[in-house]
Curated annotation (Swiss-Prot):
Gene name in the database record: PB2
Entry annotated with the keyword Electron transport: no
Organism, as annotated: Influenza A virus (strain A/Silky Chicken/Hong Kong/SF189/2001 H5N1 genotype A)
Keywords: Cap snatching, Eukaryotic host gene expression shutoff by virus, Eukaryotic host transcription shutoff by virus, Host gene expression shutoff by virus, Host mitochondrion, Host nucleus, Host-virus interaction, Inhibition of host innate immune response by virus, Inhibition of host MAVS by virus, Inhibition of host RLR pathway by virus, Inhibition of host RNA polymerase II by virus, mRNA capping, mRNA processing, Viral immunoevasion, Viral transcription, Virion
Protein origin, superkingdom: Viruses
Annotated protein name in UniProt: Polymerase basic protein 2
Keyword DNA damage in annotation: no
Length: 735
């Protein structure tokens, strides 16, 4: 009526033809609804907008309690279905058959967990301020495992469609565990298999998106991104729970940093790094398995991946910033330059015009440079400090002469292994400590008024008139490099990672020194990591290792002591022994051991275990005798008595257990009683004692009759106070 009362609309409604073919085609071709909202409106205005299977007539009454009709006897035109009222849905929801809900929380696990996190999360106040968002690749799917798409597909097929044809290879540990777990959970599950498959995919695969983010990037923050940051506002939020995938990422970074730092100071960094990666577990899963599946990009993690022969991102790292070249090219030439202190540095100069994006945790920038010249640097960051960090890194990276001339004093920074850093890192460390001279000498220039950009003065204050030459501060962040492309890299024994053109992408100098506490338990089985928990842990672990491996240690002690002394498991222990005493202690203990080997019946298991770690240092020949040996633990020197117990090393004869600094270090399986009872493991020169008497080898010989044995031949021999033991003549002569 309304429309007909207005002349213009009446004209349209009465005169306009609707038989225009194009229009009819537009709204009728294809199965896709062209105007869903409108369709919904006029459908719901009808009495029976829904169609249902004929069986519904047996399952639902014709009228509800209020007497309203629930279905019509008319068939749906063009199909064998009944027309049904929306009220029927209400009736069904209230009175329809119920089904077991036990599987819902299991199948829709990710949703149920999300609800819990939001329920227990805390939303703080809303602040209005400019948001510097930068696009980063983020994990949008909390609570997932880290399977590859293919691995997940095999697991899903095996769980949801176990009888389908097709080869499925479940190889990795995580695949097998998940499959077993899910099959048990989903027994007799009535939820549509396709739905279950979709939900499993959410649980198994990491989904990433390239999204603008200003705050936290872990998946529990990303799931509420739309609630926590807009264009000009942010809302504080603390998640109401953590998810394993974020914990894995965080713990992986900590483990990788610890391992790289430790490997740097060992004799063969690369071999040590690999040994540690292979023997470390994070939250009960092997670190190498996590590295293969986890896409986290962080300097230490990438060094570990490179060592394992995995591909990594082609961007490179300098001063804690990720650099990605976006255009231009350069060749590298060695050049000698003089610092302000007239020290000569050999630097690899990049000749040519290049543009880079620089992305750090708290600042980002665009850098344009020519040979040893910064042309333009546009920085944005969270605060003055972060912006200054980015400017320093870019100035050093530019290799400009005024930067090198700004050096005051000598450059002699060393890494953890006491090796001098390369010149570029020398310069970086120097200016990171104090950049005053650098900023003062850089030069300033007047600036034009450009929207969203301000200048920055040498004292790091903003200005609209002047700015450091070539440097501007922007309100907008620079997006992270979005590509997930991975390249083949090589790594040398000093853990420098290069791409195939030989450019250094990463080196241990780039690994952050930040210490954190891991969310998941990291178990380092490698002896190289014993010291991470301090000297006490080194002491306990060393003795635990000897006791665990006592059977082999015992044989080596008598046959091949040099090989035993050189075992890497004794390396950490040396740091506990006062430097001046190491050689003397070692000489003393080795002499003592040799006497034990030579003189029958003086073999004393406990004493060997106690003194063995001291014999690992290069020995000094001296006539020094010691009644106690000092180790530095608990901030002071503590004594280990050569004969007898002490708080550091205490063996309880009754329980046969050893405690080191009050911590249990294990039990000795054989009877290490002093004197004759220990004679079974005593060592005869030229013979190996195998154990108790074995009648198969004939009657006991006296010690003098042994001379007639051939090499490798076994015999029973009578020694000491009537003890009979089985011995074998050594295959090679060595005392």
């Amino acid at each position: 009526r309304d429309l007909m009362s207005q002349s213009r609309t009446r004209e349209i409604l009465t005169k306009t033809t609707v038989d225009h073919m194009a229009i009819i085609k537009k709204y009728t071709s294809g199965r896709q609804e062209k105007n869903p909202a409108l369709r919904m409106k006029w459908m719901m205005a009808m009495k029976y907008p829904i169609t249902a299977d004929k069986r519904i007539m047996e399952m639902i009454p014709e009228r509800n309690e209020q007497g309203q009709t629930l279905w019509s006897k008319t068939n749906d035109a063009g199909s064998d279905r009944v027309m049904v009222s929306p009220l029927a849905v209400t009736w069904w929801n209230r009175n329809g058959p119920t089904t077991s809900t036990v599987h819902y929380p299991k199948v829709y696990k990710t949703y149920f967990e999300k609800v819990e996190r939001l329920k227990h999360g805390t939303f703080g106040p809303v602040h209005f301020r400019n948001q510097v968002k930068i696009r980063r690749r983020v994990d949008i799917n909390p609570g997932h495992a880290d399977l590859s798409a293919k691995e997940a597909q095999d697991v899903i097929m095996e769980v949801v469609f176990p009888n389908e044809v097709g080869a499925r290879i479940l190889t990795s540990e995580s695949q097998l565990t998940i499959t077993k777990e899910k099959k048990e959970e989903l027994q007799d599950c009535k939820i549509a298999p396709l739905m279950v498959a979709y939900m499993l995919e959410r649980e198994l695969v990491r989904k990433t998106r390239f999204l603008p983010v200003a705050g936290g990037t872990s998946s529990v923050y990303i799931e509420v991104l739309h609630l926590t940051q807009g264009t000009c506002w942010e809302q504080m939020y603390t998640p109401g729970g953590e998810v394993r995938n974020d914990d894995v990422d965080q713990s992986l970074i900590i483990a990788a940093r610890n391992i790289v730092r430790r490997a740097t100071v060992s004799a063969d960094p690369l071999a040590s790094l690999l040994e540690m990666c292979h023997s470390t577990q994070i939250g009960g899963i092997r670190m190498v398995d996590i590295l293969r599946q986890n896409p986290t990009e962080e300097q230490a993690v990438d060094i570990c991946k490179a060592a394992m022969g995995l591909r990594i991102s082609s961007s490179f790292s300098f001063g804690g910033f990720t650099f990605k070249r976006t255009s231009g090219s350069s060749v590298k030439k060695e050049e000698e330059v003089l610092t302000g202190n007239l020290q000569t540095l050999k630097i690899r100069v990049h000749e040519g015009y290049e543009e880079f994006t620089m992305v750090g945790r708290r600042a980002t920038a665009i850098l344009r440079k020519a040979t040893r010249r910064l042309i333009q640097l546009i920085v944005s960051g969270r605060d003055e400090q972060s912006i200054a960090e980015a400017i320093i890194v870019a100035m050093v990276f530019s290799q400009e002469d005024c930067m090198i001339k700004a050096v005051r004093g000598d450059l002699n920074f060393v890494n953890r292994a006491n090796q001098r850093l390369n010149p570029m890192h020398q310069l970086l460390r120097h200016f990171q400590k104090d950049a005053k001279v650098l900023f003062q000498n850089w030069g300033i220039e007047p600036i034009d008024n450009v929207m969203g950009m301000v200048g920055i003065l040498p004292d790091m204050t903003p200005s609209t008139e002047m700015s450091l030459r070539g440097v501007r501060v922007s309100k907008m962040g620079v997006d992270e490099y979005s590509s997930t492309e991975r390249v083949i890299v090589s790594i040398d024994r000093f853990l420098r990672v290069r791409d195939q053109r030989g450019n250094v992408l990463l080196s241990p100098e780039e690994v952050s020194e930040t210490q954190g506490t891991e969310k998941l338990t990291i178990t380092y089985s490698s002896s190289m990591m014993w010291e991470i928990n301090g000297p006490e842990s080194v002491l306990v672990n060393t003795y635990q290792w000897i006791i665990r491996n006592w059977e082999t240690v015992k044989i080596q002690w008598s046959q091949d002591p040099t090989m035993l002394y050189n075992k890497m498991e004794f390396e950490p222990f040396q740091s506990l022994v006062p430097k001046a005493a190491r050689g003397q202690y070692s000489g003393f203990v080795r002499t003592l051991f040799q006497q034990m080997r030579d003189v029958l019946g003086t073999f004393d298991t406990v004493q060997i275990i106690k003194l063995l770690p001291f014999a690992a240092a290069p020995p000094e020949q001296s006539r020094m005798q010691f009644s106690s040996l000092t180790v530095n633990v608990r901030g002071s020197g503590m004594r280990i008595l050569v004969r007898g117990n002490s708080p550091v090393f205490n063996y309880n004869k009754a329980t046969k257990r050893l405690t080191v600094l009050g911590k249990d270090a294990g039990a000795l399986t054989e009877d290490p009683d002093e004197g004759t009872a220990g004679v079974e493991s005593a060592v005869l020169r030229g013979f190996l004692i195998l154990g108790k008497e074995d009648k198969r080898y004939g009657p006991a010989l006296s010690i003098n009759e042994l001379i007639n044995l051939a090499k490798g031949e076994k015999a029973n021999v009578l020694i000491g106070q009537g003890d009979v033991v089985l011995v074998m003549k050594r295959k090679r002569d060595s005392s």
